[in-house]
Amino acid sequence: MPGSEDVYERLLASVKVLTAHARARGVRFLIENHPLSTIAGHEGRRLLPMVTSDELCRLLVDVGDPGFGVLIDVGHLNISAHALGFDRVQFVKTLAPFIGGFHLSDNDGIVDQHRPFGRDAWFMPLLRDCPRAPVTIELSRARTDEILQTRDAVADSL
């Protein structure tokens, strides 16, 4: 994780408070994976935490509360996997027991474009590994027919 251990400890303390707050209201607290792009313009420095499955697993273990989980943004994941060279599918499989939801969109692996996708999208088979996780389709500048085709692709995969 970028930054000092102090940054992580502050994040951990905040997540514990937010998880307890959510649990008291009958909901889970989820944290979304961040994207890391090769074009971020930060001279190769990582400015955001929670990009890799190792970082997310560490936080999950340290929080140690079933009321805390992860929300996988597959667009962010595609960008980070492209930038860091890790396996996207293994990332999801590693975190599957903790996944509380998905944000679904397609992109070129460099920029988070929120493009429509079809039944053949790389992440579609993985949705079956987390059948209770809600999905949100995130599209930008999509035509109505693209939105409906994307919706149907997701419905068919569940």
Positions of predicted regions on the chain:
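Active-site acidic/histidine proton-transfer and metal-coordination neighborhood
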Residues: 1-70, 79
